[in-house]
Regions:
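Glycan-recognition and catalytic cores of secretory/periplasmic carbohydrate-active enzymes
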Residues: 2-586
Length: 586
C-alpha cells in the first residue's frame, strides 16, 4: 500500500473542545441524508439501476432529468457519506446508460435508434446535456480509478475533439461547436422543430402532470415553437469544456487542455470584439451572428430569446448565456489565469452601464433585441457574480453580492449562520421524505423529472461550510478551497466523527475549525488544497505553532474530543488539477 510522504507537514490538534452544535448537526446531517437517499433509491430505481418512469426524449422530461434525480449524491459521498451513496449513484448511472440506449423515439428522427449512442446523448443542447452529466462528471472526486469511468471520460471528451468520425461536432478552423444540438452522432445542421425539442406525442391529461405546466401535448409543442435557431455556436456549448477538464484531470494529457483553451480563448476573443458582451450566436463561418442575419444577440436561448408561455399567453425571457460561465471556470482551473474571470466581470459591468431611470427608479437591462436593451429590472444584472468573486477573491467584486447568508458569515457578520442553515437542511430533508412517502405516482404515470423534488441530498450548505466551496451546477467541476480525505480508509471524504467549518476566505488564506466529536477515538484527516489539488498549501498555523507545508495537502491528527482553528496560507491555482488522491502523488 502506498504510504503518505513522511517528509510532508503533519499537524496535531489536541486541545479539548466540547463538540460545537454546528459539528453535531453536520455529522448528523450526513447520516440522515444517507438514510433518506437509500429510501429514495429503493422507491424510484429498480435492481438494474433503471429509473421507474416512462423514458422520453425532449427538453421537458428527457434523459437528463432521469439522472438529475441524483443531483448532489457525488458531492455527498465526497464530503464523507458512506460508500453506499457511491454504490447507488454508480448503479443508477449504469442503469441510466442502458435505459436510454434502449429507449427509442418514433416521431422524432434524431433518436429513432436510441436516445443515447456510445453511452452519450445522440444530439441535444448543452442546457440539457450538461444537466445529464451532473452525476457522472463528479464521480472523479471519489472514484477516479474506475475503469469504466476512465474510458467514458476520454470517449466523451473525444466527441468534441473530432476523435470520433461519427461526431464531427467541432470545427478547428473556426474554433466553433457547429450547432447547439450536438452529441455522439454529431451536430444538427438544420433548424430544430418543436417536435425535436418536445419528444414523441404522449397522453398527458389524467396521466401526467408535467412540471412545466403543460396540460396536453399541443402545449408541450407550443412551449418549443420558437426554439428553432440552433445552427452555429452558442455560449451554452462552453459547458462541453467540462468534458475536457475532466479528461485532463484524469490523464494529464496536454491535448485535452489545449482543446479546452483553444475553444474558450475563441470565445474570449469574440466577446472582446463584441464590446465585452458574449454573443449568443456564431455562424458556421465563424462570424458573430452568422446564422442569425448578423445579429450577435440572436438564436435560441440568446440575448433576444423572449417567448410566449402557451398556458398564459405571457412572455418569458429565456436567455441562457449565463451557463457559458462554466467554460471560463474550467479555463481558470486549468491555467490559474485570472483573465478568464475578467471577461465575465467586464460583461456584468458593461451590461449594467446601460441602466436607465424609469419612473424615478434606476433599472438595469437583462435582455437585448432589435430595439436594444430591454427587460429592465431594479436588480443589476448579476448572473455569475458569485463565481467571479469566488474565483478572483477581489473584494471589489462583492459589490454585486448580498452581504448576508454565506457571504455574510465569511465576512464575520452572521455567527449563527452555520447552525441556522444546517437546521434548515433537516427541515428540507423531512419535507422531501414526507413528499416521497405521499407520492401516489406509478412507473407508468411518472415522468423522469417527477421524483426530482423528493431528492433528499442537501449538499449546498455542507459544501459552503465544510469545503468553502460553490455547489456544482449542470455538470461543472467542484470549485472549493479545501477538500478532505480519510487516509486510513483510503477514500475521499472527511473521516468518521470529524467535522469542519470554513470560517474565512481571502485570496491567500483559509481559516477553518476542525473538531473530533468522539471523546474516545483519535482521528486522522487529510486536508487538500482545492477539489483537485489545484491550490498549494504554504503553511498552517494552530495557535502559535506554524508548520511549513509547501505542498498540496496536509495530514492532521485530531485527538479524542479535541478541536482547534487552523489558518492555512495557500497559493491558489498554483498546481495543475488532478483526480489523483493525495497518497498517490507528491
Amino acid at each position: 500500500m502506498t504510504k503518505l510522504n513522511p517528509n510532508g507537514g503533519t499537524l496535531s490538534v489536541d486541545t479539548p473542545t466540547p463538540p460545537p452544535t454546528w459539528a453535531l448537526l453536520q455529522r448528523e446531517l450526513l447520516r440522515a441524508q444517507t438514510l433518506a437517499c437509500q429510501e429514495f433509491f429503493d422507491r424510484y430505481f429498480d435492481d438494474r439501476g433503471y429509473l421507474l418512469c416512462i423514458p422520453r426524449w425532449g427538453g421537458n422530461d428527457g434523459p437528463d432529468d432521469a439522472i438529475e434525480n441524483l443531483t448532489g449524491w457525488p458531492i455527498l459521498h465526497a464530503l464523507g457519506a458512506p460508500d453506499s451513496i457511491l454504490h447507488m449513484y454508480k448503479k443508477a448511472w449504469e442503469g441510466h446508460l442502458s435505459q436510454y440506449t434502449e429507449a427509442k423515439t418514433v416521431a422524432v428522427t434524431l433518436a429513432q435508434d436510441g436516445m443515447y449512442y456510445k453511452e452519450f446523448p445522440v444530439m441535444f443542447d448543452w442546457f440539457h446535456n450538461a444537466e445529464g452529466l451532473t452525476v457522472f462528471n463528479l464521480q472523479g472526486l471519489s472514484d477516479p480509478d474506475d475503469l469504466a469511468f476512465q474510458s467514458r471520460v476520454k470517449r466523451y471528451a473525444g466527441f468534441y475533439m473530432n476523435e470520433d468520425p461519427q461526431a464531427p461536432n467541432y470545427d478547428p478552423e473556426h474554433k466553433i461547436i457547429r450547432s447547439m444540438f450536438n452529441g455522439s452522432r454529431g451536430p444538427l445542421l438544420r433548424k430544430a422543430t418543436a417536435l425535436d425539442w418536445a419528444g414523441d406525442p404522449i397522453e398527458v391529461e389524467g396521466r401526467f402532470k408535467p412540471l412545466h405546466g403543460e396540460r396536453d401535448f399541443d402545449e408541450m409543442l407550443a412551449h418549443f415553437e420558437d426554439y428553432t435557431d440552433i445552427v452555429g455556436d452558442h455560449p451554452l456549448n462552453l459547458a462541453a469544456t467540462s468534458l475536457g477538464i475532466n479528461a485532463y484531470m484524469l490523464t494529464g494529457e496536454a491535448k485535452y487542455k489545449q482543446w479546452l483553451l483553444e475553444y474558450v480563448d475563441a470565445w474570449v476573443e469574440r466577446t472582446a470584439a463584441n464590446g465585452g458582451i458574449i454573443p449568443s450566436n456564431i455562424g458556421l463561418d465563424g462570424t458573430v451572428g452568422g446564422e442569425c442575419g448578423g445579429k450577435w444577440y440572436g438564436g435560441c436561448y440568446g440575448w433576444a430569446f423572449t417567448v410566449v408561455v402557451p398556458q398564459t399567453g405571457g412572455l418569458s425571457d429565456r436567455n441562457a448565456i449565463s451557463r457559458g460561465i462554466a467554460g471560463f471556470g474550467n479555463a481558470l482551473l486549468a491555467t490559474g489565469d485570472q483573465r478568464y474571470v475578467d471577461v465575465w466581470r467586464n460583461m456584468i459591468d458593461t451590461i449594467n452601464t446601460n441602466q436607465r431611470t424609469i419612473d424615478g427608479q434606476v433599472m438595469y437591462p437583462h435582455m437585448y433585441g432589435d430595439e436594444g436593451w430591454y427587460s429592465f429590472k431594479p436588480q443589476p444584472y448579476s448572473q455569475g457574480a458569485l463565481d467571479v468573486y469566488y474565483w478572483s477573491m477581489n473584494r471589489a467584486d462583492l459589490k454585486h453580492l448580498p452581504t448576508t447568508g454565506w457571504i455574510g458569515f465569511l465576512e464575520g457578520k452572521s455567527p449563527d449562520y452555520p447552525e441556522e442553515v444546517l437546521q434548515r437542511d433537516f427541515s428540507t430533508i423531512r419535507r422531501k421524505v414526507e413528499g416521497m412517502r405521499r407520492d401516489t405516482s406509478t412507473p407508468d404515470t411518472r415522468m423522469s423529472d417527477d421524483p426530482m423534488g423528493f431528492n433528499p441530498a442537501a449538499v449546498g450548505t455542507l459544501t459552503e461550510l465544510m469545503l468553502g466551496g460553490l455547489t456544482p451546477r449542470h455538470g461543472e467541476p467542484l470549485h472549493c478551497r479545501v477538500r478532505y480525505f480519510d487516509p486510513l480508509k483510503r477514500r475521499a471524504g472527511i473521516p468518521e466523527d470529524v467535522a469542519a467549518l470554513v470560517e474565512k476566505l481571502t485570496d491567500d488564506e483559509v481559516t477553518l475549525t476542525l473538531v473530533n466529536i468522539s471523546p474516545v477515538e483519535a482521528r486522522t484527516v487529510i486536508i487538500q488544497g482545492g477539489a483537485y489539488a489545484e491550490h498549494q498549501l504554504i503553511s498552517a498555523a494552530i495557535g502559535d505553532q506554524v508548520t511549513p507545508l509547501d505542498r498540496s495537502f496536509a495530514t492532521v491528527h485530531v485527538a479524542p474530543g479535541a478541536g482547534s482553528r487552523v489558518v492555512i496560507k495557500m497559493k491558489r491555482y498554483a498546481n495543475q488539477p488532478t483526480f489523483v488522491f493525495p497518497w498517490a502523488r507528491d
